[in-house]
């Protein structure tokens, strides 16, 4: 493998199915990253399609590929980036897959020379969030524990404190934002450019 001349700064967006991961990615792409060359890796596809734009490319991998050949998947990503570099890579991670699989693929293999994970965001739907997380088990807790911040889709502005308390029990340092806090989330998230 040739020496890779550019690191792919990476944001990992994780959460359970139907939590709003693609919705958040689409909003980031439309409102914040429209001038950025972005590669999106999807390890699950929800109901909402990823937006199509000139600056957005995507690679989709199935759960079966991820489980059987995670290092082959990482190798394909590296080869793709060698041919078509990106300013930023967004990984839409499978919400019930152990986070250590992602770490092994991109942080403790040859891919670590290419990939720099700069942000890890846990996305949740505020409706029945706690019970869905409890039912999902250990992989979900490991994702929350490793996340920098959480973005929660809520219908009510008043449910933030309850959600925050629950997430802090998994990760005391996690910053919690709701869909009603977009300006605060944006300001915090883009205070420092990682790409």
Identify the function of each model-found stretch.
Residues 42-43, 138, 165, 185:
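Residue-level signal for alpha-helical context at structural boundaries
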Residues 93-171, 175:
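Phosphate/Mg2+-binding loops and adjacent switch elements
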Residues 56-58, 139, 194:
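Short, hinge-like loop/turn segments at secondary-structure boundaries
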Residues 13, 158-195:
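P-loop/Walker A phosphate-binding loop and immediately adjacent motor/lid segment at beta-alpha junctions
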Residues 3-14, 19, 23-119, 125-130:
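Nucleotide-state-sensitive switch-loop elements of NTP-binding domains
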Residues 1-2, 147:
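Polar low-complexity intrinsically disordered regions
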């Amino acid at each position: 493998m040739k020496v890779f001349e550019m690191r792919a700064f990476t944001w990992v967006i994780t959460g359970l199915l139907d939590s709003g991961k693609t919705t958040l990615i689409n909003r980031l792409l439309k409102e914040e990253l429209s001038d950025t060359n972005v590669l999106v890796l999807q390890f699950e596809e929800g109901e909402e399609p990823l937006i199509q734009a000139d600056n957005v490319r995507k690679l989709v991998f199935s759960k079966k590929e991820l489980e059987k050949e995670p290092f082959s998947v990482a190798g394909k990503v590296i080869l793709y980036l060698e041919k078509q570099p990106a300013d930023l890579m967004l990984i839409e991670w499978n919400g019930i897959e152990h986070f250590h699989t992602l770490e092994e693929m991109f942080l403790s293999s040859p891919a670590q020379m290419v990939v720099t994970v700069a942000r890890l965001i846990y996305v949740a739907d505020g409706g029945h969030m706690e019970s869905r997380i409890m039912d999902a088990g250990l992989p979900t807790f490991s994702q929350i524990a490793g996340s920098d911040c959480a973005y929660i889709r809520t219908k009510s502005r008043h449910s933030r404190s309850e959600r925050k308390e629950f997430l802090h029990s998994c990760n005391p340092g996690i910053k919690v934002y709701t869909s009603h806090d977009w300006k605060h989330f944006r300001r915090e998230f883009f205070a420092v450019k990682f790409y």
